[in-house]
């Protein structure tokens, strides 16, 4: 079929030269649908903002036509894509600007507190303001009278060794962590993130553990999830064990795990029996 969009030589098309093939048609529909979906989510947030403004100010803000969910022409998609490109470039500049603070950590510029690992490793200089802004628990610790009056004050994180503490601080300063460091320290970082209420790090560790869950790791992850407060992670692990009962229970890791975590074994047994009962009913 003649297509005025994907052909490389539009001059050879037969009149009226405005037909498109099925692939281009579906592509255009999908693109416009995506734009409407994104603008719909923006409109929801905009409406919530208007509602809050009405409550606080006694007046409402009219809805912007930019967020209209009415059918839009394909040409608006091009404008949206250009705006997204500009937004992406702006975000890159912002990341570069914010990452300059990392040099303060690496070069120990004007550090005003020490963090000590639990393995008697050397203390690591850090900045109180950053710790307090990233963790409500750190903020409460730093607000204590003893910590305020002692510039050389050191906080000991007993649950982390030197390498794990370094990884934690690297994440706090940069908002990211190399995949090899995350893989090696994910369990310790998850527990620390839960303890010190560093929610973004906790979510990152949880997503990594869920994405890499397998026979060899599920018991370790289940153990860690029980120490933390992630119900989602714990339920995912129990469900994985139930679906792979033979492989997990007869593995070398299960006996020491069962001796250490009898309550988790009870949960696994109950979940397995409920799953078996459900299958029998079906």
UniProtKB/Swiss-Prot annotation:
Protein name as annotated: BTB/POZ domain-containing protein At3g56230
Keywords: Ubl conjugation pathway
Database matches in Pfam families: BTB
Gene source species: Arabidopsis thaliana (Mouse-ear cress)
InterPro entries listed in its UniProt record: At1g01640-like, BTB/POZ_dom, SKP1/BTB/POZ_sf
Domain remark from Swiss-Prot or TrEMBL: The BTB/POZ domain mediates the interaction with some component of ubiquitin ligase complexes.
Listed GO biological process terms: protein ubiquitination
PANTHER family: BTB/POZ DOMAIN CONTAINING PROTEIN, EXPRESSED-RELATED, BTB_POZ DOMAIN CONTAINING PROTEIN, EXPRESSED
